[in-house]
Amino acid sequence: MFPLLHFIVLIDVKDFPLTEGSTITPLCQKGYFPCGNLTKCLPRAFHCDGVDDCGNGADEDNCGDTSGWATIFGTVHGNANNVALTQECFLNQYPQPCDCKGTELECINADLRAVPVISSNTTLLSLKKNKIHSLPDKVFTKYTQLKQIFLQHNCITHISRKAFFGLHNLQILYLSHNCITTLRPGVFKDLHQLTWLILDDNPITRISQQLFTGLKSLFFLSMVNNYLEALPKQMCAQMPQLNWMDLEGNGIKYLTNSSFLSCNSLTVLFLPRNQIDFVPEKTFSSLKNLGELDLSSNMIMELPPEIFKDLKLLQKLNLSSNPLLYLHKNQFESLKQLQSLDLERIEIPNINTRMFQPMMNLSHIYFKNFRYCSYAPHVRICMPLTDGISSFEDLLANNILRIFVWVIAFITCFGNLFVIGMRSFIKAENTTHATSIKILCCADCLMGVYLFFIGFFDIKYRGQYQKYALLWMESLQCRLMGFLAMLSTEVSVLLLTYLTLEKFLAIVFPFSNIRPGKWQTMVILICIWIVGFLIAVIPFWKEDYFGNFYGKNGVCFPLYYDQTEDIGSKGYSLGIFLGVNLLAFLIIVFSYTIMFCSIKKTALQTSEVRNPIGREVAVANRFFFIVFSDAICWIPVFVIKILSLFRVEIPGTITSWIVIFFLPVNSALNPILYTLTTSFFKDKLKQLLHKHRRKSIFKTKKKSLSTSIVWTDDSSSLKLGVLNKITLGDSIVKPIS
C-alpha cells in the first residue's frame, strides 16, 4: 500500500514569467485564473473562497454574479414604495386617517371603500390595504398632477375603461395583489407618461395588444403570478419603449415567433415558472438589445439549435429546472457577451467542452453536477462547489465516515494479511483450496488499500476539499484508486462464485469427477484475475467513450450513474453491476440453498447421526452468514443501480456510505467466514499453541480432520450425514484443508 503513496501529486500555485514592464494579463493553463496584473495564476477553486490567496486580493474581486440588469435598476418593488417625503403638508383636503407630507398622501389601511376626495395638487397617492372594490369612470380626473398611484392589497375586481382618464402625468401605477380578472382594451390610453405598471398577483387570464394602447413611455411591465395562458401577437406594439418585462409565475403554455416581434427595446425578459414546453427558433430574433433572459422552471424539453442566434448582447441566461433532454453543441455559439449561464437541475447527456468554448466572457456558470465544471475550465466561478458526496470542506462529509473508513480499512487489510500469513504457515492437506483462499484474501486486501487511500486523502484535503475537488476527481491518483476498488470487487466476486460452485459440486454431487485438480485450479485462478483486471482497466482504454469513468465523485467509485452519463460508461457500469455481479450473487444464493437442502435430506436419511437438529442449525447458521454478507454487500448496490434506471434522484452522500460501510463487507468478513471461524483453523491453531503439551490430542484431532470433506474447512459445521452419503467414495473426494 505505502509505495503507492508516491503517486500523490501536490497541487501547487503556478507562476508564469512575463517580460519586464509587461502589464498584460498572464496566460494561465486550463483551469487556472490570473491574480490581477500579477504573474501568478491560481486554480479556479482558490478564487472567491473568502481567502486572499493571491496576496493582492484579486482572487476575491468580482465574485458576485452581477451580470444582467437587476443591479442597475435596483429592487424595483422596494424603490417604488420608499418615497422621500417632506415634513410639511401642502394639501388642503384629505381624509383624517391619511398621512400627508408635502404633496404626497398615504392612506394605508384606512378602511377606505372608495377613492377619497383629496386636493387637486396631490402628486403621490397611496391607498394600499384598503377595501376598494372598483374604480369607476374618471375617478382620478380631478387629480391631473398625480405621478404615482399605489393601490396594492385592495380587492379591486372592476376597473372602468375611463378610470384613469386625464392622468397624463402619471409615471408609476401599482395594481398588484388585487382581484382583477380582466382589463378592458384602452384602459391605460391616457397614461402617456407612465413608466412603471405593476399588475402582480391578480387572477388575470387574458390580455390583448390593445390593452396597452397609450403606453408609449412604459419602461417596466410586471405581471408576476397572474393566470395568463398565452401572450398576444406583437405584445410590445403599443409599448415601443418597454425595457423590462416580467411574466414570472403565470400559466403561459407556448410562445410564437411573433410574441416579441416589436419588442426592440427590451433588455430584460423574465418568463420563469410558466408551462412553456417549446420555444420556436425565431421567438427572440427581434430582441437585439436583450441583456437578460430567464426561462427557468418551465417544461421545455428541446431548444432549437439557433434560438439564441440574434441575442448578441445577452449577458445573463437562465435555463435551470427545465426537463431538457438535449443541448446542441452550438447552442450557445453566438452568445459572445454572455457572463452568466444557469443550467442547474438540467441533465446534459451530451455535454462537451466545445459547447461552452465560444462564451469567452463567461464568468459564472451553474450546473446540476459538480463534475460538469470540468467541461468549462475557462469559467472562473462554477457551481456547485462539491459533488454531493463530500461536504463543502471535507472529502468525507461527517465524523462517522472519517472514523470508520480507517476502522474498516484496518480490519479488511490486516485481517486478510493475517489469514494469508497463517494459511502459508499452517500446512494444509488440500493445497489447491488453501491457495484459492489466499488468492481471495489478496483480492480483498486491495479493498483495504483503497479505503486507506480514501482516509489519507480525506486528511490531506480536510477543511479545504472544495478547492481541490475537481482537480482531485480528474487526477491519476483518483483513477488508480477506483481501478483498485473495481479490481478487488470483481476478482472477489468471481472467486467467491468459483469457491461456491466448487463446494456445491462436492456436497450435492459427491461422486462426480468434474471437480478441478491442482493445475486446473491454478488456471482458473489466473483467468479470474485476468478477467477482473480487464474489467477494471477497460475504461482507461477509450476515454472519449467512457469519460472519466472512476472520477465521477470524491470516492472515485463508479457506483451511481444518472441519465447524463455517456452511453458507454453508463452501459458498462450497468453491465458489471446488474450483469456480472447480480448473476454471481444469484448463483451463490441458489447454490447455498440447494446445498443446505441436500445436507438436510441426507441427515434425515442417515440414522447414525446422533444430533441431526443441532448439526442442521450449525450448517444453516454458517450458510446464512455467508449469504447474508453477500446480501449486505450487493443488495444496496443493486437497488441504487435499478433506481438510476428509473431516473430516481439519490442523494450523493449515499455513495460514500455504501462504499465505506457496505461494499467492503465481503472483504472484511471473508477471512472470518472462510478461515478464522472454521473448525480446521481453530483446531490447527490450538495444535500449534499446545504442540508440546498435548501431542496426543493433536494426533486425535488430526485423524478426525482427515476424514472431513467440507470445502469450507469446517468439519463440525456440516452434517456427518454427508460422510455416510459418500462412505464408499472417501477416496474420490480429497479432504479439504
From Swiss-Prot:
It comes from the Eukaryota. LRR repeats lie at residues 121-142, 145-166, 169-190, 193-214, 217-238, 241-262, 265-286, 289-310, 313-334, 337-358. Residues 27-64 form the LDL-receptor class A domain. One of its GO terms (molecular function) is G protein-coupled peptide receptor activity. It is found in: Cell membrane. The chain crosses the membrane at residues 400-420, 439-459, 479-501, 521-541, 576-596, 623-643, 654-674. GO terms for cellular component: plasma membrane. It is a multi-pass membrane protein. The keyword Transmembrane applies. Disulfide bonds join 28-41, 35-54, 48-63, 478-556. The keyword Transmembrane helix applies. SUPFAM superfamilies: Family A G protein-coupled receptor-like, L domain-like, LDL receptor-like module. Residues 1-399, 460-478, 542-575, 644-653 are extracellular. Glycans are attached at residues 37, 121, 257, 318, 361. Keywords: Cell membrane, Disulfide bond, G-protein coupled receptor, Glycoprotein, Leucine-rich repeat, Membrane, Receptor, Repeat, Transducer, Transmembrane, Transmembrane helix. One of its GO terms (biological process) is adenylate cyclase-activating G protein-coupled receptor signaling pathway. Residues 421-438, 502-520, 597-622, 675-737 are cytoplasmic. Belongs to the G-protein coupled receptor 1 family. Receptor for relaxin. The activity of this receptor is mediated by G proteins leading to stimulation of adenylate cyclase and an increase of cAMP. May also be a receptor for Leydig insulin-like peptide (INSL3). This is Relaxin receptor 2. It comes from Canis lupus familiaris (Dog). The gene is RXFP2.
